[in-house]
A protein has these predicted regions:
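Secondary-structure boundary/capping motif
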Residues: 5-6
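Short, Lys/Arg- and Gly-enriched loop/turn segments at beta-strand edges
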Residues: 113-119
Length: 126
């Protein structure tokens, strides 16, 4: 269950906005602030040294998995939300989809969205 957006809200947004208008984002932020009382066991939020929420540890693969789990989105939809839709929104026409002339930035996953390989500008990352 998400902290930022309730699964019921995810389903509503998908139904109202449609797949072409959903963009997944991630702070993927690391912090070493102390965990304030009442948040014991919460593993996906970072806190600053004042005890305020400083960001999320959520990564895009987990965001994609959450959308698939909570909304019934397909793996194709999940990649659309994480790559194609953001590229279009930012008018980055050289990326976001696999096509001739596009940048070869690829994330290869298994059917459960576990990352297997990352290719950046045509080069496989270690």
């Amino acid at each position: 269950r998400g902290i930022h957006v309730d699964p019921y809200m995810l389903r509503l947004v998908r139904r109202i906005k449609g797949d072409a208008r959903i963009i997944l984002i991630s702070d993927a932020y690391a912090s070493d602030g102390p965990i304030p009382p009442g948040y014991d066991g919460v593993t996906d939020i970072n806190f600053d040294y004042t005890g305020e929420i400083a960001g999320s540890k959520l990564t895009l693969d987990v965001a994609c998995r959450n959308m698939m789990k909570h909304t019934g989105a397909s793996i194709v939809n999940a990649f659309q939300y994480a790559a194609l839709n953001p590229a279009r929104a930012l008018e980055m026409t050289d990326r976001g989809e696999i096509a001739v002339g596009k940048r070869a930035d690829l994330v290869i996953t298994d059917h459960k969205m576990n990352i297997q390989t990352v290719i950046l500008k045509g080069e496989t990352l270690p």
